[in-house]
Amino acid sequence: VDPLEIREIGEVIRKVRKERGMRLEDLADEHISPATISNIERGVPHVSKDKVNYVLEKLGLSLDRLPEMMTGEQKKLEDIRLQLAAVESLIDAQETKLAAEKLESLQLEDDHPFAPHFHRLRGKYLIYERKWNRAEKALSNAIRLCEGNSQAERMNVESDAYNLLSLSCYYQNDMAKAVHYTDQGLEAFNPEGERKHVKYVLLRNKGIYLERMGRVVPALRIVDKVWPELGKIDQTETVLSFYWLRSELLRRGGVLDEAMKYAQEGIEFARKNWVWISLFDLWTVLGTIYMDRKDYENAKACFDVVLSLQDKFPEKELFITTYTRIGIMYMNLKEWDQAKPFLDEAIKKGEYMNDVPRLTMALTAMGDYYRLQGNSREALSYYQRVEKLANRHNLKEMEYEAWFRLSQCWKDIDQEEFRRCTEKMFIVQEELDRQKGGVSREMV
């Protein structure tokens, strides 16, 4: 049976069986099992034509009327697919209330061909609403229902559901679990299916999660792997994310000339395509590159562009890194009064967004603000807070940084505390070595 036809035939069989109040077991007999009937209804390919005809005969369905019934079912499927596409557009446009209303009006049963897609969208909507447990339940349902569903396999629903699970973990500051889900999503990806961009979104997100963990080398390996395929990616923002990621990772590795090249190329690409969010990120990294070169005049010029763009974005977590780096720039210039308001604002936004990787960077910078002015006791509370957050969320690079800075503070105050901190540094470094990825200790 043609794979396209089996889907519509299966829908006709499912509809007629349910209209007659029959269970799968009621239709099964010694010649056909409930599992085989379920496969036919779900449009599983490679089902025996004889089995399909046998079920049709058992239901008394006329072969003459079947094309007409299939056309009707195909129209219904197309209508539902359109409604689901509308829901996804509304979610992406942050019109979540209307999206929720449309999802509620659909309420597809689990054996419907689009049920996995429905639950994936429900999970996506709940992530936007920051209802993590309910989102993860919906996405787990989507993944469960993908098994044997040819429509879901063709649409790469399972792969995308894993991507959304990774985002849920990322927003809850569980980077290791987020990376795990991206790996599962990549394993589930169907290269012959639709929505091929999902593969590159998964790779991009995995790179970002590793970057947040301070694991520069494995993140850069992902970027290097994807780079020759950038022309295949049909999402401009995803392409620009790779420009930002490559520039940021090279900067952290000290390869400043190359980092600048990719930042500038990305800025030009983003400008031509009016992608403001990417301009924000790329100007931020370019300003940081100039700061690393101690070219503070150009760094300030870059950050001025970033600050002029900030009103375009509701995503306040974007500002945490930018404000932190501007604060660091002013500290390098010894303009302490200019630095503190930016660091205060970075911490405030990091706390509000519960963005632990960015918050720990801001807190570290504030600790540096006090320590570099000779106020080590005031700095201690910031570094201690970083250590607790980093330890709780398995951010080993940042935990190492916290113990190192704590040891700097205690060195001239309390030798016992100094020794304790250096021992902790050694323990964390051993853990980093086991990870075989945490090579860069620069967090901002």
Q: How should these model regions be labeled?
A:
Residues 1-19:
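A short, Lys/Arg-rich alpha-helix, primarily the initiator
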Residues 20-39, 342:
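Short alpha-helical DNA-recognition segment
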Residues 48-66:
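DNA major-groove recognition helix of helix-turn-helix/homeodomain DNA-binding modules
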Residues 72-73, 106-114, 145-157, 188-197, ...:
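Flexible helix-coil transition and linker loops at the boundaries of alpha-helical arrays
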Residues 80-93, 116-132, 159-173, 198-214, ...:
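Tandem amphipathic alpha-helical repeat scaffolds
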Residues 96, 132, 175, 216, ...:
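TPR-repeat structural position
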Residues 103, 146, 189-190, 223, ...:
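Eukaryotic all-alpha helical interaction scaffolds
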